[in-house]
Amino acid sequence: MNKFDSIRPYTDNEVNEVLLDLSNNRRFLKMLFANGEYSYLRLLPFSRKILGFILRNKVKSIHDVQSYQNFFESIVNSVVENSIKNFTVNGIENLNPNTGYLFVSNHRDITLDSALLNLTLHKNNLGTTNNAVGNNLLSEKWASDLMRLNKSFIIDRSDKSKREIYQSLNLASEFIWDSISNKNESVWIAQKQGRSKDGNDFT
């Protein structure tokens, strides 16, 4: 057992099984009915079974993290095209594809902050990042599964003793160090705990 198992992203050999579990998760399906392109299905008889069947067909060929991220990329591209007037990137040519980096950014949206960075990296043939996410955002297992499929690792922000807080933060620090120094994988973290809700997100 790896000491990072409780916080690490899912690995390639876990991806398909997790996706199939999600296609049978009542709470996840309920979320899809309430939001997005499948909302019309909720009016049909056996709607949950129908949606589960659709999802299983979509994910049956996804067996690794890269394939999942390719699937996810089209969603992020759509967000950029439909909601951002001007998206520019500078300095990407200075990154070495064989080196892991620590990316620290301001924080407005836990999904899009890292997604926009990773879209840029992917389009420039660079490896995507492991992304830090607080467990306070992952009370539902399906939410945790989605984030860990997309290379997120968990920062434990539960109310604990000072000793337990130190241990959990130390484990996260070790994971970050191992990713960058030993595996040459990059990591994204927000510059502070909690996103800025007033637009004032300067360091």
List where the protein language model places each region:
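Membrane-anchoring hydrophobic helices of lipid-metabolizing enzymes
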Residues: M1-Y101, H107-N118, H122, S144, ...
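Soluble catalytic domains of membrane acyltransferases
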Residues: F72, E81-T203
